[in-house]
Amino acid sequence: MKIFAVTSPDAGRQDGSPFAGLEARERYEIPDSSLLRSGQPFFVPDFADEFQAFPSIVFRLSRLGKGIAPRFAARYYDSVTMGCAVIATGLLRQLRTQGKPWCRAVAFDKCCMTGRFIQPDEMPESWSIQSGDCSLVYPVGNIMTGFGDILADISRDITVKEGDLILASLSPVGIPLKQGTRLSVINEANNYKILDISIR
């Protein structure tokens, strides 16, 4: 199984974001040991001072493909959810300044949180992400319809397979993760909690 994370197209224009200055979408691959499912605890690592969770809609692919045209993208996934990419933000800024690869800051065990998968037509317009005293709203917006371009970009270079996950549009801003809190992703229209993780 492969896991891909993709920044949002406007991430580079967000002041204070660890992605500030990016001129286009950036993608990176995460090892399968990074997967952390809803209900499992997240233990804050000790190799950096600050960790933040960056929400994203997650697509689960359902078939093999390469060089997939955007118009065929809907044939290649069967379910979606919300997830979060955990990033060592200070370390990422340092690595970017030094022109080094991002992997130490973005690809480590249990850094990819995923919620319960639902059918694509069940995806609401937005989600509320809460952790401790911090919260933000993740607008799904045009990500569902724009997924074809993202899948086309990835599959141009890499063969995708059934079970692969794509975090298709990381929020430009994250939520700090502090021990003793919980990270929850909620549909406020019906109070459905799609992701809930204890931070330890």
Model-derived segments and their meaning:
Residues 1-165, 172-200:
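Catalytic-core "active-site belt" of small-molecule-metabolizing enzymes
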